[in-house]
Amino acid sequence: MYIGRFLVFGKTEEGYPFVTYRVSSRSFPNRLAKVMDDDTVSILPKELEEMFKNPYITYNCVKLVGDVAVATNGSHTDIIADKIKLGLPIRDALSYSLLTMDYEKDDYNTPRIAVVITKDEAYMGYVTDSDVRIKKVELEAGKAYYLGVYDACKITEHQVISVTGKTAEDLTKFVMDYEEFEKPVTAATVLVKDGFKLATL
């Protein structure tokens, strides 16, 4: 099944919250996730001149703000993080940012998807050309929701998978290797365990 770029978030079998963002692509297999600093993971083209060809190629997919982790499929990562930094509640920061940025104005009207987690709370949201939704969800150890841009842009108990892995590296590899979702390119994970742990693949 091809669901494009997607987020997987839940709890490890040990009960630690995490979120993984994976780029999947039929057309652009030359992307990489790179840890830029202690608070940011970016998606970059391997050939840097490509970033000028499309406004949706280069973006921060992960931002850490205090005790909050934001993960998305686009430049709205920064908007959500900035609003949280200014003191907005997570739900309001998600709502404002998704409505303001709207879906991507590309050939596919690609949805914007987002997940925000702390050690105690988890929110997911999306905006499409016909819908917008934000929801706080309860996480269960060993289980994770997934939210994708193609044929999986919905918030439902039917989009839950079992997960294995104890470290951020384990979880990144698990999501990259998850065979049901086709065309893996790169991925990044934030694990909430004694602070934040970042990993990319």
Curated annotation (Swiss-Prot):
Alphabetically ordered keywords of this record: Hydrolase, Purine biosynthesis
The keyword Repressor appears for this protein: no
Pathway per the UniProt entry: Purine metabolism; IMP biosynthesis via de novo pathway; IMP from 5-formamido-1-(5-phospho-D-ribosyl)imidazole-4-carboxamide: step 1/1
Pfam family, one: IMP_cyclohyd
Any one of the GO BP annotations: 'de novo' IMP biosynthetic process
EC number, as in UniProt: 3.5.4.10
Enzyme type, top EC level: hydrolase
This protein's name: IMP cyclohydrolase
The gene coding this protein: purO
